[in-house]
Amino acid sequence: MEFPHSVLLVVLIIATFAISNLVQAEEDQEGFISLDCGLPPNEVSPYIEPFTGLRFSSDSSFIQSGKIGKVDKSFEATTLKSYMTLRYFPDGKRNCYNLIVKQGKTYMIRATALYGNYDGLNISPKFDLYIGANFWTTLDAGEYLSGVVEEVNYIPRSNSLDVCLVKTDTSTPFLSLLELRPLDNDSYLTGSGSLKTFRRYYLSNSESVIAYPEDVKDRIWEPTFDSEWKQIWTTLKPNNSNGYLVPKNVLMTAAIPANDSAPFRFTEELDSPTDELYVYLHFSEVQSLQANESREFDILWSGEVAYEAFIPEYLNITTIQTNTPVTCPGGKCNLELKRTKNSTHPPLINAIEFYTVVNFPQLETNETDVVAIKDIKATYELNRITWQGDPCVPQKFIWEGLDCNSKDALTLPRITSLNLSSTGLTGNIAAGIQNLTHLDKLDLSNNNLTGGVPEFLASMKSLSFINLSKNNLNGSIPQALLKREKDGLKLSVDEQIRCFPGSCVITKKKFPVMIVALVSSAVVVILVVLVLIFVFKKKKPSNLEDLPPSSNTPRENITSTSISDTSIETKRKRFSYSEVMEMTKNLQRPLGEGGFGVVYHGDINGSSQQVAVKLLSQSSTQGYKEFKAEVELLLRVHHINLVSLVGYCDERDHLALIYEYMSNKDLKHHLSGKHGGSVLKWNTRLQIAVDAALGLEYLHIGCRPSMVHRDVKSTNILLDDQFTAKMADFGLSRSFQLGDESQVSTVVAGTPGYLDPEYYRTGRLAEMSDVYSFGIVLLEIITNQRVIDPAREKSHITEWTAFMLNRGDITRIMDPNLQGDYNSRSVWRALELAMMCANPSSEKRPSMSQVVIELKECIRSENKTQGMDSHSSFEQSMSFDTKAVPSAR
């Protein structure tokens, strides 16, 4: 975007200068970030820009590098205060601003560069802009004397956002303004990618640019007009209350064709003929039509009808947008509004926005690693020019002294090596190092570090090499770290802090005698306590330890293994067998039967709290010790997407687990359609998938120690009365063997069809085994096919899906019960994700965190389609994609 330099100041005065507006404007900037780049330290910050009412702050707190410049005096008379200064970056390849934002919130990011011949060289600086690790755009700052503005809508993946300037040739990058504006998350939605502003017009013969405070989102609306048009307007304020909040004075004017019987035509040239566009058309009737008058027209894109018989509402906004990105043949976009036979008035339009799609595929470094390395940077006050932006990516900008790895495009990069040798470090070894959980090599040698060698180094299991030599460390090396060294860790330290057994001299005084005496006394006390405990236990035979074991439980598995009664949590959730019989009304209502036993419906004390009681079958082969361990484990697992354990029964030969009751049964039940229920809609299926993925993500990274489900399948995804999905049987599958499948290895557990082939082959269990099984479930959700069907040519669901994908026909892959009611982009995205999860190689599968992110993007894409009600007076949707069947990607 570009604005004419000679009229910039006058335009903004005409469009925005009103005292009442400025007072209101100062109150309406919540969430705004407005940085005046290069504002001198001796000037007031923040300050109010007198002509716009925007509150600007110095950028000095948001970047560690750069120098201050000022535009040539010839520009001062017609330049706003915020454009007078700039920050330029003669040093380093990449220089980055770091901003605090809200993860998942949509922001409009705007970068403005007014060269103003600040360096007296009269050149055209050209450089790249990056958001985080991803290329955003190339900014040619000398192309327009008036300055260049670049905007993009972006959703941060963390609470920290980097905007980077990257040198691409001999010219020096610089920036005049950097601004962030929060947007509503339900506006400007895409199936994938972000929206880069290409043009934003309001159709008027005015010369005024409309911006803040008229536009509360601080979008910049340029006027445009053509000799083939005629302007009409109203003095009344229209209703602009849809998600886009187009300024009211934008909607007070409209353009119609100069010839009433002719179509209205609008053309736009793209920068590249391959660009994909999202188009937003804003309409509001500005004339009060009589009962016998009408304004009705068709909307055509590139000669094809995209919307028929549209009628704008009087003084009420309607936004029509593309559901999917569109292209322009030869790079020339043609919009045509053609009146219908029923219309007495020509078509009109008030405003139009064009956005090109820009993709940000590179994942940023794991947030835990980023926080840790920034903590280390702050601890040692490191000011390396390369230590800006993302630590690991892009690879060409990796921070000096770091090595990182990333398995594939769906795996977050991790820091694996930190080399701060000979960098003048002082103080203690930084505690933040322990948070680099994938660190393999650590080199802090040849510095001035003091203090002791920290214990946490021994607990960093990924470390294979540590060099702490040539420092001023004192004390001794922790014994745990010495043990790690014996086990293969390469440890380099100065000799004065090494203390091998037998090498440390101890003064021979009376201390050894005292130590022997103390140890002897302690031994006597311990023996006495043990005897008393033994006697006490003999007098209390009613304890759980001394009850008869269940018929199939070896005695050695019971001794001293009862669930700890010292935990209040455990006591509160323990039920007697008589209470179990009471809550189930003597096992009156069975809900189902699995490999572990029968599940019964129940309620606690006749209350409204319904429960599902799983009684351990006498034929089950698990041991009491495993049952105890699972109960202790399940009692500490709490997540909204995991079926919660209400309590348990542990009495003689009666073992039971009591779960919350899930009234809508399981996912498989609803997909099968055999029980007369309604068909699950596509967006409901996606939400169920997200819920289940969140539950698994919690097991993998939210639990300590982490857990692997081992039996992810559609029957283990239960649904409550609100159709919130919760994973079930996420603990017992580790400890129990299936009674009906005793031939399955005691090492490998799971359900045929869902079982990770790599886990089955190697016996090595990891979180990626759950990811594979989840991929199979996702394919079930998409296709409603049986996981294994011998009647099919391709019996396994992954083989069948791959076969159908090669034929490129998505309608034959999708569940026919959906009857085509879905957004094809969200389907393709979900399908690709499912196939990645079900990849035979675990290294090529995404993590559950990545699965959650991708599924949420699918939901955003689908909701964007479903949320645009065709009967709404505020917003209607339009699809320029006229193909009924998408081609294979």
Curated annotation (Swiss-Prot):
It is a single-pass type I membrane protein. Its EC number is 2.7.11.1. The modification Phosphothreonine is found at residues 746, 751. The active site is at 711 (proton acceptor). Residues 1-25 form the signal peptide. It is found in: Cell membrane. Its main location: membrane. Residues 585-874 form the Protein kinase domain. It is an enzyme of class 2 (transferase). Keywords: ATP-binding, Cell membrane, Glycoprotein, Kinase, Leucine-rich repeat, Membrane, Nucleotide-binding, Phosphoprotein, Receptor, Repeat, Serine/threonine-protein kinase, Signal, Transferase, Transmembrane, Transmembrane helix. ATP binds at residues 591-599, 614. Residues 26-514 are extracellular. The chain crosses the membrane at residues 515-535. Residues 536-889 are cytoplasmic. GO terms for molecular function: ATP binding; protein serine kinase activity; protein serine/threonine kinase activity. PROSITE patterns: PROTEIN_KINASE_ATP, PROTEIN_KINASE_DOM, PROTEIN_KINASE_ST. It catalyses: L-seryl-[protein] + ATP = O-phospho-L-seryl-[protein] + ADP + H(+); L-threonyl-[protein] + ATP = O-phospho-L-threonyl-[protein] + ADP + H(+). Belongs to the protein kinase superfamily. Ser/Thr protein kinase family. This is Putative receptor-like protein kinase At3g46340. It comes from Arabidopsis thaliana (Mouse-ear cress).
